[in-house]
């Protein structure tokens, strides 16, 4: 298993941060993420799996920091990992041993996990936030969270699911939902990320709504950390729209 980083960019194409995505290659062939993640969930391996992602992401951040590159990386976590005592302790140890890392390590948890009425999960999210970790609600709009849970969750970012973005601009009802969601996020002082942006029409429309960050194939495919390091060191971190990287 290895990490491929996907950039999060502002509407002008300037890289602001990254998301760590897991990739698994067997005999030179890529295994679909949906497949191996489902297998890990079925066999109770998600905590071990997420620990590998965490460790590799921390190594990337440390490598970049030595090169003078300070770009946050988000990792995806589920409820089981955060409820695992040893995994939670590892996160807390990171904040104690390397305080600067918490400024550059964002924790993404899906709205479905946030919606679960699990007091210990919410308590641990609040503790992580108090120790400096940024919390992001992933796949926003696809779960079943109430507005009260959104207020109670210590998140500072919401990610609009690609299913909404893919409907821009042809579905007027979805467009109204997007507009309302972005206005709600602004009212709650939350940052906004739209995922699945694949066309300049979508980019410009989201920009007109005030969306702050975007990610998707329009800005480039997920790539190894060394690739982004080479891209970011010699010049200003700005991508050509439509850049591709396998």
Regions found by a protein language model. Give the residues of each.
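Conserved functional hotspot residues or short segments at active or partner-binding sites
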Residues: 124
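Catalytic core of bacterial c-di-GMP phosphodiesterases, primarily the EAL and HD-GYP domains
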Residues: 10, 14-19, 24, 45-121, ...
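Short, conserved loop/turn and helix-capping segments at secondary-structure boundaries
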Residues: 34, 40-43, 171-175
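Active-site core of bacterial EAL-family cyclic-dinucleotide phosphodiesterase domains
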Residues: 1-39, 76, 137, 220-223, ...
């Amino acid at each position: 298993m290895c990490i491929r980083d996907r950039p999060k960019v502002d509407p002008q194409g300037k890289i602001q941060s990254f998301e760590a995505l897991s990739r698994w290659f067997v005999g030179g062939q890529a295994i679909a993420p949906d497949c191996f993640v489902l297998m890990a969930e079925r066999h109770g391996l998600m905590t071990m799996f997420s620990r590998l992602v965490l460790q590799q992401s921390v190594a990337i951040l440390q490598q970049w920091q030595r090169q003078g590159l300070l770009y946050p990386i988000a990792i995806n976590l589920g409820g089981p990992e955060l409820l695992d005592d040893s995994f939670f302790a590892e996160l807390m140890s990171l904040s104690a041993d390397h305080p600067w890392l918490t400024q550059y390590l964002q924790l993404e948890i899906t709205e479905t996990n946030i919606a679960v009425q699990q007091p210990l999960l919410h308590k641990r999210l609040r503790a992580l936030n108090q120790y400096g970790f940024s919390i992001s609600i992933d796949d926003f709009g696809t779960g079943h969270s109430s507005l009260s849970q959104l207020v109670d969750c210590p998140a500072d970012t919401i990610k609009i699911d690609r299913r909404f973005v893919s409907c821009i601009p042809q579905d007027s009802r979805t467009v109204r939902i997007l507009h309302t969601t972005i206005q709600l996020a602004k009212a709650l002082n939350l940052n906004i990320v739209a995922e699945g942006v694949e066309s300049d029409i979508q980019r410009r429309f989201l920009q007109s709504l005030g969306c702050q960050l975007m990610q998707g194939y329009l800005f480039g495919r997920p790539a190894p950390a060394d690739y982004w390091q080479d891209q970011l060191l010699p010049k200003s971190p700005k991508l050509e729209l439509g850049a591709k990287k396998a």
